[in-house]
A protein has these predicted regions:
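N-terminal secretory signal peptides that target proteins for export/translocation
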Residues: 1-10
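Bacterial N-terminal signal peptides
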Residues: 11-24
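Carbohydrate-interacting regions of secretory-pathway proteins
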Residues: 26-246
Length: 246
């Protein structure tokens, strides 16, 4: 009787230990989807993979795999060829508080041609923009207006520009046109941030520093150029890698 009782107690103890271990594992944070652009099909991009659209000759310079942008004038450089389905990883950091920049996906060939020839108004193409904005931009807005902006954030907005179209994933901006990030994940001025972008069949998804944050679907156009933006302040990009998909 005693030995049987002891065996029952020992068995119950083992089950309790397993239950507690399982609970501890389930409470642990999930690993981040940190995609670094390594593996089959990925290609490192540099100066030779971009063409100037409407920037000055000295706006962009490349050294040891890092793209340095002065921010002046406002404009873009584009991929040599347009793309449809692809993945992108890139790291970026602003060198000045309140810096503004972006990565354009599917920038329309018509708008790029118009910018190159100076035939259209504005300095930026039509397409889907993945915003690259420093915290200082939001802080300056909040100080001036006494509240947070309802039309932009500094943590990875995704939105259409010009006549381009997109159905944004929630949460949305006040006007319903932008996909706001579900979390505040970007780091401040001088610190490197990591973006992973998936652009497939007219759908865009953005991961910020390893966590999915924003995106949209039903994008038009869904074919076009990949562009890096110069918009007023110095910024650097590095470890830019692209995988073109069928």
């Amino acid at each position: 009787m005693g030995s049987t009782y002891s065996r029952l107690l020992n068995g119950a103890g083992c089950w309790l230990a397993l239950i507690f271990a399982s609970c501890a594992l389930s409470a642990a944070p999930l690993p981040k989807a940190f995609i670094n652009g390594e593996g089959p099909g990925w290609k490192a991009w540099g100066a030779a993979d971009f063409a100037n659209v409407n920037c000055a000759e000295d706006t962009w310079s490349w050294e040891d795999g890092v793209a340095h942008c002065t921010g002046k004038p406002v404009g873009v450089i584009r991929s040599v060829e347009p793309m449809t389905n692809f993945e992108l990883v890139v790291e970026w950091r602003h060198l000045k508080s309140a810096g503004n920049s972006g990565v354009f996906l599917w920038a329309s060939p018509e708008s790029i041609k118009g910018l190159e020839k100076g035939e259209i108004k504005g300095r930026l193409p039509n397409g889907i923009e993945v915003q690259v904005l420093d915290h200082g931009f939001s802080e300056r807005y909040e100080k001036k207006h006494g509240k947070k902006s309802d039309w932009f954030t500094s943590h990875g907005d995704v939105f259409p520009t010009g006549p381009a179209e997109m159905t944004p994933f929630p949460p949305l901006s006040g006007n319903g046109k932008r996909s706001f990030p579900s979390k505040e994940l970007t780091k401040g001025v001088g610190e490197w941030n990591h973006y992973y972008v998936r652009a497939i069949n007219g759908e865009v998804r953005l991961w910020v520093n390893g966590e999915e944050a924003s995106g949209g679907t039903d994008c038009h156009p869904a074919t076009g150029y990949l562009c890096l933006e110069s918009e007023g302040s110095p910024i650097e990009f590095k470890n830019l890698r692209v995988r073109v998909l069928p």
